[in-house]
Amino acid sequence: MPDSCCFQMDSGVSEPGEQDLTEAGAEQELRWLDLGSEEALGAGTQGPSTPQAWGHLLQAVWKGHTGLVTQLLRQGASVEERDGAGRTPLHLAVLRGHVSLVRLLLQRGAQVGAADRAGRTPLHEAAWHGPSRVAELLLRRGAPANARCLAGLTPLHWAAALGRTLMVGHLLAAPHPGPTAADARGWTAGHWAAAGGQMAVLELLGANGGARLDSVLLVAAAAGRATALRLLLAQGAPVDARDGVGATVLGVAAGLGRRQDMEVLLEHGADPSLTDRHGRSALHRAAAGGHLLAVQLLAAWGAEVDSQDLLGLTPLHHAARGGHIEVTGHLLDRGAEINAAGWLHKTPLHLAMEHGHGPTAELLLSRGASPTLRTRWGDMAQDLWPALCGEQEES
């Protein structure tokens, strides 16, 4: 629920369906709940986590009926009742944004850190759905800001992913907020904010030391968040940060064809000559992906068109193997060696033919590729041509 709604809900003006009930009204509502439950049981179509299958207290909380909730608690209803998903009345009150019920349940001893079957606490629900006023209330009552669900996500992860800046501020101000805590995939709140392009949250996390700038920069590049890249670089992120296989941020962006991101990185000093653990440069990655605009940009910035990876393959090899005819043509225009011998002495023409890319092979032949050069096993590209032509005719 947006933060802008929370003040209206807690201003003393009842929202529809949340008015206090008289004792008579409560009894009438209780009978209605009985009828609804009986109808649901008779239908047999509702699961254990749907309102129709809940007990009276959970249903009353879901509908925001403060008077009925009060009566049920007086009659001995358990404040720790659970639905089929393991959620307590407090979870549901937070989820629905019923601030007055959140207060009431806490006053009646509801466990502020109770976790459902997915490991989510009421504070997780507040970070995802609820008004910021609810989060403040939960935190004042000692809700653990660093609680993790089964996926390893804290409330801060959720709030950051959604760009809920005010909520993030509340969570960062709490004891042990865990801004550097990583989830099951190794992502911090900063990673989630970068993936979603949540600029205000990124600024806030950066000011609080909650962002691992190198890996967050990689996420921003993979997600195509050019504005986030600029912010992170301004905060001191290393422009040539590397991922687990040694690819630089520029390499990641190039492999995905993110030209705008690449421009930002190059303007901030990214080195196009750096390679990953396999010896592949950003140009290798762009060529392999068939990203013509990325290839053109890197070539214009001086990327070496004949650089070889650990298998001896050049960007032209990668383009030919993928059948990326426009990229192949552009690399040739930039002076790429057409008969470069790579792994097993294979040329770009060998790879184009082996992988069934007739048009690319024809382009290479028209530009002077030799059909008679042999691989280490003695194979010539021209020997593959009849088979390739046969495949094309069949298709």
Swiss-Prot record:
ANK repeat copies, ranges: 52-81, 85-114, 118-147, 151-180, 185-212, 213-241, 245-274, 278-307, 311-340, 344-373
Keywords: ANK repeat, Repeat
Pfam family, one: Ank
Entry keyword Repeat: yes
Domain of life of the native organism: Eukaryota
Record-linked InterPro entries: Ankyrin_rpt, Ankyrin_rpt-contain_sf
UniProt protein name: Ankyrin repeat domain-containing protein 65
Organism per entry: Bos taurus (Bovine)
Gene name for this UniProt entry: ANKRD65
